C-alpha cells in the first residue's frame, strides 16, 4: 500500500512544481542523474550476455507488478508469466535493484548452496533496519556461524525435547481458554495469539496476559513494517514499525537487566528459555553477545517463528477438509496416540516422531502455500549460469513458486495430496521443495515450528471430534506475507465427548 501512496505523492509533487522551472530543474537533476547511473550500470557490460527480461521503470522496476500478484489468489503468476516468456533465467528489477530470477531446482541449488562463495545475504533495507544489523539474518561468514551455534542451544533437538512439555501445556491451556465451549471460532486470530503466547513463554518467560498482548501488538507492527517500502514519514507502515521496535527494545532491555540479576542469584537457569541461553552463551574465545545482538536476534526469532508457523496452522484444517481420506488418517493417527496415554500423561518426543500422516499434511500445506515468496541474495562475483552472466552486485532471486507449483515436479500441483511426502519425501527431487530455504541459511527454527504445528493438531483432535468450515472455498491471500485465509477461516466446532 505504501508503494502506491509513494507513487501518487510523487505525481502530485511534480504537478505542483510545473509552475517553477528553476525548482523543477533542481528537483529533476538528481533524479535524472540516478537514472543515468542506473542505465550505465545496466549497460556498461556490453561484452557479457545478460539474461533476457526487462527492468521496468527506473528505481521502481517491476516491484508493483510483483506486489499485485502476491496479493492475489495466484501469487505464482508473476514468475510463471516471465518463465513462459523468457525461460528459466530472466532479469527484472525489484525494490530498486536489478535482479536475476533463477527458476527450477538448479536455480534453487545455486542460490541456496553457494553462500559466501557466489552470493551473500542482503535483504531489503526496511527488513534489515527493523530486524536488526546484529541479527543472524544480517550476519555473514564467521559471525553468522557463531550465532547459529548460540541459537542451536535453544533450537537443537535435545533442547527442544526439554521444552516439549511447556509448549504442549501452553497449547492445551490455549484450547481450554479460547476454543472450548465455543460453537464457532475464527481460526486465524486465535492462531496468531497462540504463536505469540508460546514465543513469549519460551523466549523470555513472560506469562502475564497484558504484557503478552503488548508484545504481540509491537511485534506484528514490526512485521508489517519490515515488509513495506522504507518511507520514514508519519503514518507509513515503516515509521510505525520503527516506533514499535524502539518500544520493544525498551521492554526487552528491562527483561535482560532483570534476568542477568536472576542468573547471578541462581533464581534463573542458563537453559530456562531463549533469553537465558543468549545471555550465558560464550563463543570459542569466551566472548558473549552484546545486548544489541540479543535484542536483534529476539526480533529475528519472532519473525522466523511467525512466518513459518502461522500459515500451516491457519490452513491445515482447511486443506484437510478438502481431502477426506487424509483427514481421516490424521485424526486416527492422533486418536491412537491419545488412546495410548494414561490419565494426565504428557505427550512425548516419541509420540511426535510417530505423527507421520500429520507431518505429511503439514509438508503439503507448506508446498502449496510457502511462507515466503522468494529468497534474495547478492552476487559477490560475476556468476556464469546457463549461458548468461549475472553481474557482481546484482540481486539473485529463487522462488519456491517456481518448483512447488509446477506440474513437472509435483503433478497436479493445485491438489492437496500429502502422500507426495510418503517415505519421508525421499522421492521428491532435491531442491524442488524449499519452504525453509536451504544450505547455511536454512531456517534455524524450522524444527521448533514443526513441533508447534504438530502439537496444535494434536490438541485440536483431543478436544474436537469434527468441524465444518463456514466457507470451504474461502480465498487464500498474501498481504504481502505469508499466505493466509482472507477472512480468518471460521469453523463450526463439534466437541469430543
UniProtKB/Swiss-Prot annotation:
Protein name: Taxane 10-beta-hydroxylase
Keyword Heme annotated: yes
Keywords: Heme, Iron, Metal-binding, Monooxygenase, Oxidoreductase, Taxol biosynthesis
InterPro entries: Cyt_P450 (IPR001128), Cyt_P450_CS (IPR017972), Cyt_P450_E_grp-I (IPR002401), Cyt_P450_sf (IPR036396)
Function (record text): Involved in the transformation of a taxadienyl acetate by hydroxylation at C10 to yield taxadien-5-alpha-acetoxy-10-beta-ol.
Pathway entry: Alkaloid biosynthesis; taxol biosynthesis; 10-deacetyl-2-debenzoylbaccatin III from taxa-4(20),11-dien-5alpha-ol: step 2/3
GO MF annotation: an example: heme binding
EC primary class: oxidoreductase
Cofactors that this protein relies on: heme
Gene Ontology BP term (one): sterol metabolic process
Positions in coiled-coil regions: none
Similarity field: Belongs to the cytochrome P450 family.
Positions with a binding annotation for heme: 443
Entry EC number(s): 1.14.14.105
Catalytic activity: taxa-4(20),11-dien-5alpha-yl acetate + reduced [NADPH--hemoprotein reductase] + O2 = 10beta-hydroxytaxa-4(20),11-dien-5alpha-yl acetate + oxidized [NADPH--hemoprotein reductase] + H2O + H(+)
Amino acid at each position: 500500500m505504501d508503494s502506491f501512496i509513494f507513487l501518487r505523492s510523487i505525481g502530485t509533487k511534480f504537478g505542483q512544481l510545473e509552475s517553477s522551472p528553476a525548482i523543477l530543474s533542481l528537483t529533476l537533476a538528481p533524479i535524472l542523474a540516478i537514472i543515468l547511473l542506473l542505465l550505465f550500470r545496466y549497460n556498461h557490460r556490453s561484452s557479457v550476455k545478460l539474461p533476457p527480461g526487462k527492468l521496468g521503470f527506473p528505481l521502481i522496476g517491476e516491484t508493483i507488478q510483483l506486489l499485485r500478484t502476491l496479493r492475489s489468489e495466484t501469487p505464482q503468476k508473476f514468475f510463471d508469466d516471465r518463465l513462459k516468456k523468457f525461460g528459466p533465467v530472466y532479469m527484472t528489477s525489484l525494490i530498486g535493484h536489478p535482479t536475476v530470477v533463477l527458476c527450477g531446482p538448479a536455480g534453487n541449488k545455486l542460490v541456496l548452496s553457494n553462500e559466501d562463495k557466489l552470493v551473500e545475504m542482503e535483504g531489503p533495507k526496511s527488513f534489515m533496519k527493523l530486524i536488526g544489523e546484529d541479527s543472524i539474518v544480517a550476519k555473514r561468514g564467521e559471525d553468522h556461524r557463531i550465532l547459529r551455534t548460540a541459537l542451536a542451544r535453544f533450537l537443537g533437538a535435545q533442547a527442544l525435547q526439554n521444552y516439549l512439555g511447556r509448549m504442549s501445556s501452553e497449547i492445551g491451556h490455549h484450547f481450554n481458554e479460547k476454543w472450548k465451549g465455543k460453537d464457532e471460532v475464527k481460526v486465524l486470530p486465535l492462531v496468531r495469539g497462540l504463536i505469540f503466547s508460546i514465543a513469549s513463554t519460551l523466549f523470555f518467560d513472560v506469562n502475564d496476559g497484558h504484557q503478552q498482548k503488548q508484545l504481540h501488538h509491537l511485534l506484528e507492527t514490526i512485521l508489517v513494517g519490515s515488509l513495506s517500502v522504507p518511507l520514514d514519514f508519519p503514518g507509513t507502515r515503516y515509521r510505525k514499525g520503527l516506533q514499535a521496535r524502539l518500544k520493544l527494545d525498551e521492554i526487552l532491555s528491562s527483561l535482560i537487566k532483570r534476568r542477568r540479576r536472576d542468573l547471578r542469584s541462581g533464581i534463573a537457569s542458563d537453559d530456562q528459555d531463549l533469553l537465558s541461553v543468549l545471555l550465558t552463551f560464550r563463543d570459542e574465545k569466551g566472548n558473549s553477545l552484546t545486548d544489541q545482538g540479543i535484542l536483534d536476534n529476539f526480533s529475528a526469532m519472532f519473525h522466523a517463528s511467525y512466518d513459518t508457523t502461522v500459515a500451516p496452522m491457519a490452513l491445515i484444517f482447511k486443506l484437510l477438509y478438502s481431502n477426506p481420506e487424509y483427514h481421516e488418517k490424521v485424526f486416527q493417527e492422533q486418536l491412537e496416540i491419545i488412546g495410548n496415554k494414561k490419565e494426565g500423561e504428557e505427550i512425548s518426543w516419541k509420540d511426535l516422531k510417530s505423527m507421520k500422516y500429520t507431518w505429511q499434511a503439514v509438508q503439503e500445506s507448506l508446498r502449496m502455500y510457502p511462507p515466503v515468496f522468494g529468497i534474495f541474495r547478492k552476487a559477490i562475483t560475476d556468476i556464469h549460469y546457463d549461458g548468461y552472466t549475472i553481474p557482481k552486485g546484482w540481486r539473485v532471486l529463487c522462488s519456491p513458486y517456481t518448483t512447488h507449483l509446477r506440474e513437472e515436479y509435483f503433478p497436479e500441483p493445485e491438489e492437496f495430496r500429502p502422500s507426495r511426502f510418503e517415505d519421508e519425501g525421499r522421492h521428491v527431487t532435491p531442491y524442488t521443495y524449499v519452504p525453509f530455504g536451504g544450505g547455511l541459511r536454512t531456517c534455524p527454527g524450522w524444527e521448533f515450528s514443526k513441533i508447534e504445528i504438530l502439537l496444535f493438531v494434536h490438541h485440536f483432535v483431543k478436544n474436537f471430534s469434527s468441524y465444518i468450515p463456514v466457507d470451504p472455498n474461502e480465498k487464500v491471500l498474501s498481504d504481502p506475507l505469508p499466505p493466509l485465509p482472507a477472512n480468518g477461516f471460521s469453523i463450526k466446532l463439534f466437541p469430543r465427548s
